[in-house]
């Protein structure tokens, strides 16, 4: 197991910055999208949970290690947020791709339950995959900074995709069933509580976000 260290930088303010960075790709567009099977506003957080669970499963992180990874994810998002503010979203994404592409054997593609047929479904898929790609590239930067190899990064990205497929499978029993099960898996893997908000649409899905 790699030494993740015991120190963690303060994250209270940074949590909001991370959420904003992810949500640049998942901005809500009105009532038409409100009750989708998979809420775009939650995609970035779901993929983040998938990523942390993958890291814990593959690299046997303890709680301090998990918190270190989460703090590093937030720090990477700060760089992206700063570049977005200075250069604009397109340039910031281009810079992120350039930094991460050499460490990725292939692009990260978020799995789908079924291919969209309607235009709004295609738009939703595009934006959901954009959110997933953003989180995955933050994750790649974290792994690279911690000294993991390209092969280990590829294995972790596959694990994230597998975790998201499981989330989609759970969602067949209902969207909130999937969210609860994802939160349970996160708690079991990390020992960190992940509350689920009871009122759909009023708040973020996960009461405690990374």
Give short role names for the model-derived ranges:
Residues 136, 154-157:
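Short amphipathic alpha-helical surface patches that serve as generic macromolecular interface elements
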Residues 65, 111-112, 153:
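Extended non-catalytic scaffold regions that mediate assembly and binding
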Residues 2-55, 79-144, 173-210:
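Intrinsic disorder/low-complexity detector
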């Amino acid at each position: 197991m790699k030494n993740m260290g015991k120190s963690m930088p303060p994250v209270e303010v940074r949590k909001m910055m991370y959420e904003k960075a992810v949500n640049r790709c998942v901005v809500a567009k009105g009532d038409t999208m409100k009750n989708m099977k998979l809420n775009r506003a939650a995609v970035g957080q779901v993929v983040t949970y998938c990523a942390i669970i993958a890291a814990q499963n593959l690299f046997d992180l303890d709680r301090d290690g998990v918190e270190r990874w989460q703090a590093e994810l937030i720090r990477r998002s700060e760089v992206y947020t700063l570049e977005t503010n200075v250069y604009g979203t397109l340039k910031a994404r281009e810079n992120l791709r350039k930094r991460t592409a050499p460490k990725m054997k292939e692009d990260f593609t978020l799995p789908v339950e079924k291919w969209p047929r309607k235009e709004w479904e295609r738009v939703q898929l595009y934006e959901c995959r954009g959110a997933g790609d953003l989180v995955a590239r933050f994750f790649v930067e974290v792994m690279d900074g911690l000294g993991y190899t390209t092969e280990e990064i590829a294995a972790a990205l596959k694990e994230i995709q597998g975790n998201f497929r499981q989330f989609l499978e759970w969602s067949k029993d209902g969207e909130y069933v999937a969210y609860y099960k994802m939160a349970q898996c996160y708690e079991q893997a990390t020992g960190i509580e992940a509350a689920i908000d009871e009122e759909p649409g009023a708040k973020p899905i996960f009461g405690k976000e990374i």
